[in-house]
Regions:
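Specific alpha-helical transmembrane segments that line the substrate/conduction pathway
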Residues: 33-44, 83-120
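Specific transmembrane alpha-helical segments of multi-pass solute transporters/efflux pumps
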Residues: 14, 18-19, 54-97, 138
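Hydrophobic/small/kink-forming positions within alpha-helical transmembrane segments
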Residues: 13-16, 20, 47, 72-77, ...
Length: 198
């Protein structure tokens, strides 16, 4: 459990560092090519790694092709293209907004489970969601609530970032459909399909 928590922490920290780097890169390349180049390279590395670890049989779809295309599209097309498009359109403030929107993923996951699967969260989860939301608001605004008055000028950008984040949440939840597969196998096949769609 501790190893899993550490893995999640490292992934979150990596994501946080990704947006400042992307801010510089997006001055020279649009979000579509940025996503394609990044995950095209990642897909090749994952294919080699999966082939070495699990062999050719790991590339069999086992009747889950449509699901893999859907979840791959959610992660590697919807998430990557929209979150970087929103960040690019917002300019410098997009770095902070995109980073903080990532912090809302647990809240979004709980809301999706509550609305779609009727899995009502426990009281402590709702309390945690509210605290997380308030914390995110204070970080985004730096305590300056007049920030909300400027949202009308950035609604499209915010919508792109939010939809992108929802896409990633759906992707991670989709891992349950392949629970008998390794994380590497699910990641590789969805990355290949998602990058192809991009």
């Amino acid at each position: 459990m501790i190893i899993g928590a550490l893995a999640c922490l490292i992934a979150s920290m990596s994501w946080g560092a990704m947006f400042p780097v992307a801010d510089h890169a997006l001055e020279y390349i649009d979000p579509f090519y940025f996503s394609l180049i990044r995950y095209g390279a990642v897909a090749i590395m994952l294919i080699i790694l999966l082939l070495m670890k699990e062999g050719k049989q790991a590339f069999r779809l086992e009747g889950r092709g449509k699901l893999l295309v859907f979840f791959g599209t959610m992660a590697f097309t919807v998430y990557n293209v929209l979150i970087f498009l929103g960040q690019m359109l917002m300019g410098k403030s997009g770095v902070m907004v995109a980073s903080i929107m990532e912090a809302l993923m647990p809240m979004i996951s709980i809301c999706i489970l509550w609305g779609y699967k009727r899995v009502k969260p426990k009281k402590y989860m709702i309390t945690s969601m509210i605290i997380a939301f308030i914390g995110a608001v204070f970080v985004i605004t730096k305590g300056d609530m007049s920030f909300f008055l400027t949202l009308k000028d950035n609604m499209f950008s915010l919508a792109c970032i939010f939809v992108g984040v929802v896409g990633w949440v759906i992707y991670t939840m989709g891992g349950q459909t392949c629970s008998d597969w390794s994380t590497l196998r699910y990641s590789t096949l969805t990355c290949v399909f998602g990058t192809t769609v991009t």
